[in-house]
Amino acid sequence: MLILSINRKTDFRVFAIFIAVVLLIGGLLWAWVVVSYTPDYTTENTFSGSDYQSSVSTSAEDSLLTIEIDSGEDTLGWDQLSISIQVDNQDFPCSLTGISTVQQEDSKVNTRLTADGTTFAIEVDASSEDSFTGINLQTMKQVDVENHSMKFSKTDIFLGNDSVAMIVTNQSFSELQSIPNGTFDLDDSERLDWYDYDFSVHRINPKDQVYVIQESNITYKLQFISYYNDADESRHIQMLVAWLNGSPLPAFDDPTLIAESPCIIEGADDSWSPSQSITIRENGIDICNQACSVEIS
């Protein structure tokens, strides 16, 4: 009886060690998957650029280069694209409408216009665990949380006191051009259910849906794009916001936010298809008047 008891204890210890080793290996493998995770690109298209003409002048209206989709089959919406050129380490944002945004300094809300000149791409630093970052949609800028349209902290996103919203799942951000039928059934009483959690790679993924937000006499459309910035740092929420209905958006009259775009995108249709090339032209600013190196981003 004594020998049998010892064998049982030994078997239990071996089994416990086996389980511990399996858990350890599984944990290490999961950690490796998380650390080595590579975010998916929003498009698999690749692009190429070439000189539009053999020489340039000092006219500040020169067409500088053409850009085309070199490979890939995605048709890209201008409301989700940003195109800029760099010359002599200076960045020049380009747009269809001739307006762009001024770089915002010392703010947790980074706002810029996309290539269509009407949609705002916004990145919110929601990294603080002790306080919320507020944004006013009329100005597209950071505000105190007392005056916010929305507020952000980590994954927690709340509407403001004067904001209501509905969720649209049957139209994309680009397709949504008017207020849809439905009820504005979301308010500031609870946080937005805007993401899914992928446990396998420990990632926050925005749901494929568009928010229609009504505040005062303006209605907006909004889509969350990412929980991560371009450096893949978490708690930096990226979203697209555009006017949908109502009074004109005050943000477009703010000279500290809106400026004339130094370059124009020409030859564009409603979207950028693989068969279409575009031209980048100077917009009253002499970007290049002699041989120069141009980078496209």
Regions found by a protein language model. Name each.
Residues 3-297:
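Surface-exposed, beta-sheet-biased, low-hydrophobicity segments with strongly acidic/polar composition
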